[in-house]
Amino acid sequence: MLQQPTIRHPIAVSLGAIAGALSRYYLSLWFAQRFGITFPYGTLFINITGCLAMGFFYALALERVSLISPEIRLLIAVGFLGAYTTFSTYALDTFTLLGDRNLVAAGFYWAGSTILGVISIQIGIILGRLCGKGLGV
């Protein structure tokens, strides 16, 4: 039964999602305790590092499909990173900052998440490709 992809794939996604959601939760708590809740530092950090990880994984695994099994690709890209990164929270946080009339913080958060996210994807791709070359793949 566990040999069937129709069973293995959802299990892989689920296991990754548990780890991603818990990572997001505990990082958000840590940032709130460390820096307060007046600015969504945790969500910003999670979005940027999630983009970096997705770019790295894309370059290392998805461009070199034979390197990593489909279950591991699903576990990381769909499960872990899907649960870890949350641009819906990004939108809500921006909306909340705007509602609080904190226009400078809202503008920085909105633009910073987008610009730094795209830059982080590119850096992740470069790092993934360099790491792949170092592994001889």
Curated annotation (Swiss-Prot):
Q: Where does Na(+) bind?
A: G82, T85
Q: How is its activity regulated?
A: Na(+) is not transported, but it plays an essential structural role and its presence is essential for fluoride channel function.
Q: Which catalysed reactions does the entry list for this protein?
A: fluoride(in) = fluoride(out)
**What family does this belong to?**
Belongs to the fluoride channel Fluc/FEX (TC 1.A.43) family.
Summarizing the function annotation, the protein's role is: Fluoride-specific ion channel. Important for reducing fluoride concentration in the cell, thus reducing its toxicity.
**Listed name of the protein:** Fluoride-specific ion channel FluC
Keywords assigned: Cell inner membrane, Cell membrane, Ion channel, Ion transport, Membrane, Metal-binding, Sodium, Transmembrane, Transmembrane helix, Transport
InterPro entries, per the entry: FluC
Q: Which GO terms describe its cellular component?
A: plasma membrane
One MF term in the entry's GO annotations? metal ion binding
Which gene is this protein's source? Answer: fluC
**Ion transport recorded as keyword:** yes
Transmembrane feature ranges: 11-31, 42-62, 75-95, 107-127
Compartments reported by the entry: Cell inner membrane
Q: Which GO terms describe its biological process?
A: cellular detoxification of fluoride
Cited PANTHER family = FLUORIDE EXPORT PROTEIN 1-RELATED
Membrane topology type: Multi-pass membrane protein
